[in-house]
Amino acid sequence: MLMATPTSRASLNLLRRSPKPKYFSSSSCHFRPSTFRKSYPCPIWSSSFSFCLPPPRSTTSTSLSSSSFRPFSSPPSMSSAAAAAVESVVSDETLSSNPLLQDFDFPPFDSVDASHVRPGIRALLQHLEAELEELEKSVEPTWPKLVEPLEKIVDRLTVVWGMINHLKAVKDTPELRAAIEDVQPEKVKFQLRLGQSKPIYNAFKAIRESPDWSSLSEARQRLVEAQIKEAVLIGIALDDEKREEFNKIEQELEKLSHKFSENVLDATKKFEKLITDKKEIEGLPPSALGLFAQAAVSKGHENATAENGPWIITLDAPSYLPVMQHAKNRALREEVYRAYLSRASSGDLDNTAIIDQILKLRLEKAKLLGYNNYAEVSMAMKMATVEKAAELLEKLRSASWDAAVQDMEDLKSFAKNQGAAESDSMTHWDTTFWSERLRESKYDINEEELRPYFSLPKVMDGLFSLAKTLFGIDIEPADGLAPVWNNDVRFYRVKDSSGNPIAYFYFDPYSRPSEKRGGAWMDEVVSRSRVMAQKGSSVRLPVAHMVCNQTPPVGDKPSLMTFREVETVFHEFGHALQHMLTKQDEGLVAGIRNIEWDAVELPSQFMENWCYHRDTLMSIAKHYETGETLPEEVYKKLLAARTFRAGSFSLRQLKFASVDLELHTKYVPGGPESIYDVDQRVSVKTQVIPPLPEDRFLCSFSHIFAGGYAAGYYSYKWAEVLSADAFSAFEDAGLDDIKAVKETGQRFRNTILALGGGKAPLKVFVEFRGREPSPEPLLRHNGLLAASASA
């Protein structure tokens, strides 16, 4: 997922992907989506999903001083008044040592704390306001006099705000929350001020209407068109009274989305179940018991062990999932499931009223802009329309329904044959447990027994080897080159085939429930940019971070991953590749910037397909103790199990996408239906087992209420069609033909990964594939092609 949404999960089925398929999107992205950062979360089945930095001075030196980030480096045209305003800010003794305001090569994640946020952000905003005023006075409809100074303003805010927003996601404290909450309205006010600037808007329109328009590159034309459209969507055409109302709505939406995600995090942290009786945890694997004992030790039970306890279960994914999959204790499964399903739905952490207010304000915003509903606003910057999105969801739902019904019948029959008392009354806290038992029986695969073959170091080695084969890049550790926010964070350098650095990325792999948001996401730190390059460099190199929440090392063992966790790492790496391998030098359309939201999941979901490719899987599946490769027969079983319960997993994702669209098209805040009524109604056609009456999954659906996926969750399925078809190009070329794979990989790199937001995604896809996308490969990969043909 692109970080734009802390990922929330309502049940294990949400966390588990459909056999093919942010969060937490930085809430700073409510405005000007092509210029302000977004991050991209995984879909709910996995675990959950900033922008721009500098290149080294040379290919051999580790010094990055020639490209340091300088928050107060003034453009040459800055007036003396603006310069004086900057000087008054910088000269303040309390600010001179503020890490948010210092020149840096890489963000000083290790030295920023809550005390720096208020003074640092306010000083930065004062400086940027002076720059904006100067730009408005001197703006001309030319690239050097409009786009370049605008990019500098946007970039400075993006990088610095992205730094503190990232720390809030991975190193949360009450003090940091409070500081960000205090300055957030001022940051939003500036973003609105920038987005609604008439001089800038008119200058962009003048460029579009000039005789030189046709001579501009496609990337520059896309940039101009996006700026004009986004200005309209941010209210520039409204009269003063309506624009003031619009701005109040945006401020309130920003606050509400932050509060929503904080409530989800706090509610997730709040639940802890202490178990002292080993009978209660029968069936749970040693890896889970070790994790539970480790949690108990951290809570003061110093003598806790995996064998004898005590054990603490939490709602964090590495803890929650094993309970739902393996606990024979049905009462325990029910308790944990209900706790997970009801997160942030009661007491001080209740998100119900927040959801209602968010939906109400989004509808008001849409009406002010002249749209019928918020979904139309959302789709204005996407590939799809409301009608096309609904059409795709219904086509996939029809192809999935009968298979999902049969899945449930198979599950009940299997449970009955095993003598399960619940076989005739199977419900939500039973399906995951019995699905795991059926999968073990049918394919002789136990996911826990696979863990020793998927140690994190081997998985990363194999992933980097695949990237070299497909895209001709080398990835090497660069730990110590950049400050990090936790000792477990790794830092890597990406090099081209000539050995030149072209990008960098951080990787934060492990769950830290006490301070880190759940889920998995990729986000930008800095983007590739010609304008932001420092003296002596032609372009600033992109930097990304990948964040996961997988099982941490237990005892002296490395992190041993489930296959789902392996897929998640591949997924986030796909996002990072599109950010890092861009060839666009226009910073506002480089990498993932300005790509339509329903196309950004293409590279991430494409990369997941390689987890099932034999040579790739065998390169990462090495037993952590013996070095033994995963047995061939086990690989074949894993491949055969790929479409296991495909209809059920597909339907689950379609439910999330459908309720999202319904809430943003037909739901009337304050009307006869509640949000939960809508959820129940949509579930009639998208869930074989009806949801519980007390189902409150919406209260933790961060993708659409605290991220970038409002009226956009369908994007996972939309992009799934694109990604499956893209992977089929490699199948057509021959997956065993290394020469053909390399050639196809280079073509993928030169189109999908390189062109960024500078070209319409459909054009990019056609350039790679030679034709428009087809849903056939997706249905074939999921084993649903026959169902589709008869639907």
Swiss-Prot record:
Stored CDD domains: M3A_DCP
Mutant lacking the gene: phenotype: No visible phenotype and no effect on germination; probably due to the presence of the presequence proteases PREP1 and PREP2.
Taxonomic superkingdom: Eukaryota
Catalytic activity from the UniProt record: Hydrolysis of oligopeptides, with broad specificity. Gly or Ala commonly occur as P1 or P1' residues, but more distant residues are also important, as is shown by the fact that Z-Gly-Pro-Gly-|-Gly-Pro-Ala is cleaved, but not Z-(Gly)(5)
Residue ranges of the TM segments: none
GO molecular function: metal ion binding; metalloendopeptidase activity
Catalytic residues (UniProt): 572
Binding residues annotated for Zn(2+), in chain numbering: 571, 575, 601
Effect caused by changing residue 572 to Q: Loss of catalytic activity
FT transit peptide: 1-82
Principal subcellular localization: mitochondrion
GO term, biological process aspect, one: proteolysis
EC id: 3.4.24.70
Binding site for substrate: 703-709
Enzyme class: hydrolase
Gene Ontology CC, one term: chloroplast
Function according to Swiss-Prot or TrEMBL: Oligopeptidase degrading short peptides from 8 to 23 amino acid residues. Plays a role in the degradation of transit peptides and of peptides derived from other proteolytic events. Does not exhibit a strict cleavage pattern. Binds salicylic acid.
Family stated for the protein in its record: Belongs to the peptidase M3 family.
Protein name (record): Organellar oligopeptidase A, chloroplastic/mitochondrial
Origin species: Arabidopsis thaliana
